[in-house]
């Protein structure tokens, strides 16, 4: 089976969640093969380790793999941030997606 680079999607917290003073960022990683990825979260240029949870890759129906990573923040941390980046490393290839709070006020 050929190598396949992951598709990465990064979603900001919902306004409903922000209303409860929580903010969870969701990084979805899909369609990669082989099934091993490293996920690094960054705030600005700083690596974030607190509040991070990454699932183990699971096989999709097309025999490629998918995984997701979550970053839990408080709403105030999210709103005062300059944005967060989900950096996915797969077979030496790096894919980055960034989300900023200004996108949905």
From Swiss-Prot:
Disulfide bond annotation, renumbered to this chain: 27-86
Domain Ig-like: 2-100
Keyword line: Disulfide bond, Immunoglobulin domain
Keyword Oxidoreductase: no
Signal peptide: none
Pfam families per the UniProt record, alphabetical: C1-set (PF07654)
Transmembrane segments: none
Cross-referenced CDD domains: IgC1_L (cd07699)
SMART domains registered for this protein in UniProt: IGc1
Coiled-coil region(s): none
Matching PANTHER family: IG-LIKE DOMAIN-CONTAINING PROTEIN, MHC CLASS II-RELATED
Extra remark: This chain was obtained from a mixture of normal immunoglobulins.
Protein name per UniProt: Ig lambda chain C region
């Amino acid at each position: 089976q050929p190598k396949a680079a992951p598709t990465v999607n990064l979603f900001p917290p919902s306004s409903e969640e922000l209303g409860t003073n929580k903010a969870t960022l969701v990084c979805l990683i899909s369609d990669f093969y082989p099934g091993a990825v490293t996920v690094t979260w960054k705030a600005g240029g700083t690596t974030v380790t607190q509040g991070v949870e990454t699932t183990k890759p699971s096989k999709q129906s097309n025999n490629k793999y998918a995984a997701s990573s979550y970053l839990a923040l408080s709403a105030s941390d999210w709103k005062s941030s300059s944005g967060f980046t989900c950096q996915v490393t797969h077979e030496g290839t790096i894919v980055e997606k960034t989300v900023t709070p200004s996108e949905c006020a």
